[in-house]
Amino acid sequence: MEYVVMIIILLALFFIFTVFLNTRYSFDEKCLVLKFGLSKTEIPINQIVSIKESDKYGVADNIDYKIGMPYAQPDRIVIETTNKRFLVFLNGAQQFIQKYKRVSV
């Protein structure tokens, strides 16, 4: 019985970690979709001006929105659109930039 309770607790912690503490992203034909916790942010690809890596730890100039947890994920990306700037905390910044380049062509 003790093992069953332990397994349930571990599964619950795993679920919380994967859903609430990771920044997930996907690209479709027209939008970049960023998900963190229960929030979902859609950025039209045609409005993205630039995407670059950042070394800022939660503080950056003129950032309108922060997506993700600064200390749980090692990579930071600044997404600049025509009217907003996003600081995104995620894993795999290089893969993100490569996927964006393939989609934005």
From Swiss-Prot:
Disruption phenotype: Loss of resistance to the bacteriocin sublancin 168. GO terms for cellular component: plasma membrane. GO terms for biological process: bacteriocin immunity. Residues 22-105 are cytoplasmic. InterPro entries: PH_SunI-like. It comes from the Bacteria. Its main location: membrane. This is Sublancin immunity protein SunI. The lineage of its organism: Bacteria, Bacillati, Bacillota, Bacilli, Bacillales.
